[in-house]
Structures are given as C-alpha cells and as structure tokens.
From Swiss-Prot:
The keyword Chloroplast does not apply. SUPFAM superfamilies: N-terminal domain of the delta subunit of the F1F0-ATP synthase. Keywords: ATP synthesis, Cell inner membrane, Cell membrane, CF(1), Hydrogen ion transport, Ion transport, Membrane, Transport. F(1)F(0) ATP synthase produces ATP from ADP in the presence of a proton or sodium gradient. F-type ATPases consist of two structural domains, F(1) containing the extramembraneous catalytic core and F(0) containing the membrane proton channel, linked together by a central stalk and a peripheral stalk. During catalysis, ATP synthesis in the catalytic domain of F(1) is coupled via a rotary mechanism of the central stalk subunits to proton translocation. F-type ATPases have 2 components, F(1) - the catalytic core - and F(0) - the membrane proton channel. F(1) has five subunits: alpha(3), beta(3), gamma(1), delta(1), epsilon(1). F(0) has three main subunits: a(1), b(2) and c(10-14). The alpha and beta chains form an alternating ring which encloses part of the gamma chain. F(1) is attached to F(0) by a central stalk formed by the gamma and epsilon chains, while a peripheral stalk is formed by the delta and b chains. Transmembrane segments: none annotated. GO terms for molecular function: proton-transporting ATP synthase activity, rotational mechanism. The gene is atpH. PROSITE patterns: ATPASE_DELTA. This is ATP synthase subunit delta.
Amino acid sequence: MTNLSVIAKPYAKAAFEFANEYNLLQEWSKQLKSFAELVQDDAIAAIISSPEISQTEIINTVKDQLDEKFFNFVALVAENKKLSILPEISFQFENIRNVHNNIKVADVTLAYAIDKNTLANLKTKLEEKFSCSIDMNVIIDPVILGGAVIKVGDTVIDDSVSGRIETLKSILLS
C-alpha cells in the first residue's frame, strides 16, 4: 500500500460506512468522483496548495451546493489539509464499495474494438469464472496484436498474440 493510500483509506472507510448506513452509496460515490476530478484540475490544485488560503475557506465557497452530510465530510478532509488526496479517497471508497457489493473490476485490453454482444458474452463468462459481478474497463492497445489480456484483481489471463509470441520465443531460446 502506498503512503497516499494509507492516509486515504480511513477517510474512505468512514465515508463508506456513513453512506452505507444512510443508503447514500450512489450519491456519495458520484460526489467523491466529482470532487476528485475537481482537485486534479491544475488551477484548483494550485489554490489548494496555496498557503494564503485555507482549505476550509475553499470548501466553504461550495457549501450551499452540497448535501450537509457530504459537506461535513469534505470539511473534515479540508480541516486536516488533505483535499489533495480526494482522488485516492474516492478510489479507496470505490474499492470498499465493490467488495461490499461483490463486484470485481476487469481491465480488458484488446488490440481493437469489438462489438457489444462479444463484450457482453465476455462479461458473462468472467462473472461465471469469478462468481461475482464484473465492471469492465476496456482498453484498446494495438501492441498486443490480437486476442486479449484480462486483469481481475491479482489474476492475469494473457490470451494475446503478443503474449503467445513471447511464450514461443522463451521456449525456443531455452
């Protein structure tokens, strides 16, 4: 775990537990993602890191636009001068949410785009294999030449042409 994730995880866990208790997971997920994107903007990041303006003052400018409970959470983060880690808090929140909902994320790397039916079939097969719901991130990377590389958690399934070539190459060289 990186230092950033160690700092962010307690915030994410507290946010998740609160949102789950009050049935606000969807709303808090969206709001955390929005704030995470906001603090990654270069101009906003410069303001946040400025010693001339407190992070609490920055958050107070959007107080009227936020749900009171979510504002209180973000205000706590600001009070602790941790607004810059909101992207990691959001990431950790989603990880906790996925575990809670028995969802795994599959990064599917393809050489070229494929049709929706094939993607749906692949998703169904992955859900059967891993006995859970799957959220798929499709990445197009022509370097793999064909086939697919699928990463789900610590499991990697490399059925790419480039992977097969590398395997064949190592066999021939040994």
